[in-house]
């Protein structure tokens, strides 16, 4: 989960998030290299005393600074496309959960368990217990198993929302009249937090998402025992 004054990304809890962190580091390394080369060229330009007013032809140099950026773009695009296709891949999910965005709360439906439906509201400050997180904890958590592919079906009943849990590498828009889907496989148990990531009105900041990930054997005893 996130920590106060955190600079980097949250720890990965799914294979997709691990890939995203790796791609982030890969792209950042290329960006730092480009910045270093540009600053070095500027430094040489400002410090050298040699000047020339003659226009010279440099076909080799022009070829290099045309091909080199193309190679850099390919090095960034290929892993990016790979992750993009991974996020769209649906691998025979074991469970399906439907999430419906409202102003300003979420409704969840366990479609594999008799259509169990419940609402999830942010806990007001007066109802917070010791250890609860302000603006992040909810009255009803979504309980899901680890080490099992889960499919989220996401939509909205009023305006645009976005269902996002950073530690799982998930962010899917909730669009009225449209049903989007995403899958994930959590790799470790715990409680993980997210929020609506699409400005949806005055109380946009008060739409937290809380996932409680538990071992599969415990989940099979009753998927909503923690509610």
UniProtKB/Swiss-Prot annotation:
Which of UniProt's keywords are assigned here? Copper, Electron transport, Magnesium, Membrane, Metal-binding, Mitochondrion, Mitochondrion inner membrane, Respiratory chain, Translocase, Transmembrane, Transmembrane helix, Transport
Q: Which reaction does it catalyse?
A: 4 Fe(II)-[cytochrome c] + O2 + 8 H(+)(in) = 4 Fe(III)-[cytochrome c] + 2 H2O + 4 H(+)(out)
Which EC numbers characterise this protein's activity in its record? 7.1.1.9
A Pfam family (short name) is COX2
Subcellular location field = Mitochondrion inner membrane
Free-text remark on how the cofactor is bound = Binds a dinuclear copper A center per subunit.
Where the protein is mainly located, per its record?
mitochondrion
For this protein, the record's NCBIfam families field holds: CoxB (TIGR02866)
Instruction: Tell me, in a sentence or two, what this protein's role is.
Output: Component of the cytochrome c oxidase, the last enzyme in the mitochondrial electron transport chain which drives oxidative phosphorylation. The respiratory chain contains 3 multisubunit complexes succinate dehydrogenase (complex II, CII), ubiquinol-cytochrome c oxidoreductase (cytochrome b-c1 complex, complex III, CIII) and cytochrome c oxidase (complex IV, CIV), that cooperate to transfer electrons derived from NADH and succinate to molecular oxygen, creating an electrochemical gradient over the inner membrane that drives transmembrane transport and the ATP synthase.
**Name by which UniProt lists this protein:** Cytochrome c oxidase subunit 2
Organism field: Gorilla gorilla gorilla
Gene that this sequence comes from: MT-CO2
């Amino acid at each position: 989960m996130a920590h106060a004054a955190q600079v980097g990304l949250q720890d990965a809890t799914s294979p997709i998030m691990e890939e995203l962190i790796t791609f982030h580091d890969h792209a950042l390394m290329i960006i730092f290299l480009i910045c270093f080369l540009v600053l070095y060229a500027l430094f040489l330009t400002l410090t050298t005393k040699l000047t020339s007013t003659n226009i010279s032809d440099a076909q080799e140099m022009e070829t290099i600074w045309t091909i080199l950026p193309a190679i850099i773009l390919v090095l960034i695009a290929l892993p990016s496309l790979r992750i993009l296709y991974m996020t769209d891949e649906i691998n025979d999910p074991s469970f399906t959960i439907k999430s419906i965005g409202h102003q300003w709360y979420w409704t969840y439906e366990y479609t594999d368990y008799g259509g169990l439906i419940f609402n999830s509201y942010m806990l007001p400050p007066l109802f917070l217990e010791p250890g609860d997180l302000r603006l992040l904890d909810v009255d009803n958590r979504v309980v899901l198993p680890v080490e099992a592919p889960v499919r989220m079906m996401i939509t909205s009943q009023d305006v645009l929302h976005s269902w996002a849990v950073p530690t799982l590498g998930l962010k899917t828009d909730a669009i009225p009249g449209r049903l989007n889907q995403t899958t994930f496989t959590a790799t470790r148990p715990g409680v993980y937090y997210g929020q609506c990531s699409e400005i949806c009105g005055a109380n946009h900041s008060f739409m937290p998402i809380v996932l409680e990930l538990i071992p599969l054997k415990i989940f099979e005893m009753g998927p909503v025992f923690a509610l």
